[in-house]
Amino acid sequence: MFRSSQLLRNGIRGMRNARIPIIQLKPSPFMPMRAQLYSTKANNEPPKLRFLFYMFIFASGVLYVTGSQIEKKKPKSSFTEKEFEEYESSSGLKRRSKLISTQDAEKYKFFVVPYVHQNEFITKIAQKLGDKEVRIIDPEELIKREREDESRHYSYLLQDLAQEDKPLPKGLVTALIKDDIKFYLNTRNGTFDTNFLIKNYPQTTDEAIKFENDISDISKCIVLHYDMLNELKKNKGEENARLINNVVGYYETVNKAKIITAKHDELDDKLQEISLEFI
């Protein structure tokens, strides 16, 4: 018992005198980051707001530049006169001009009769237009002359179409009328104020639009009520009658159609009565 107590006291005394080595712990690499995260958590919000603000500015700039490029590539649908002149100068293109210039629009007037069965009506209308020089244009005569004169531009084409019984290409009648008007303007009579009266034309809306694009505006479309009602379908067929009626409707929409009431006895070929309500 005494020996056990002595050993215990010696052990305690030894522990007191023992030197305990000090171990230096290496700092963990995660400790500073963790500490920093905790220490700056409250300060993270302002950088996030700045980042979103900068992203908004950047995105807005990209959208603006992209939109500007698309707008530049988009073809313009309208020009001022100055812009058009600059465009013509830079591109080398010239705008399509009508045969009759704006300055000559008052000097030369154009009247069309989509369908007429008897030439007496054309004579009466020409008399009403007699305050100026009057030139009557018959597309059928122009086609015949062009076909028979092989020196003319469309002669062989018209010959082939006639042999094969094919319809005329779109715009050909208007081209022949344009050539005839151009020739007339270079004559002495063409220097005077002139009313042009074109019979049996236009008979499609395509020809009507081409005339106004290439030659001049139409002053009036004269609609012969009797012939349209009684002779048109009988002589031109249902489909052609429909096309000609569409022409009348086209001019009515632009307020350029003038209906002339003409009456005569159906059993008598001679014109007995005509009343003109004109312009």
From Swiss-Prot:
Single GO cellular component term: mitochondrial membrane
Stored InterPro entries: P-loop_NTPase
Membrane topology (UniProt): Single-pass membrane protein
Cellular compartment(s): Mitochondrion membrane
Span of the transit peptide along the chain: 1-35
Transmembrane feature ranges: 51-70
Keywords: Membrane, Mitochondrion, Transit peptide, Transmembrane, Transmembrane helix
UniProt similarity note: Belongs to the AIM36 family.
The name this protein goes by in its record: Altered inheritance of mitochondria protein 36, mitochondrial
Source organism of the structure: Debaryomyces hansenii (strain ATCC 36239 / CBS 767 / BCRC 21394 / JCM 1990 / NBRC 0083 / IGC 2968) (Yeast)
Gene name of the encoded protein: AIM36
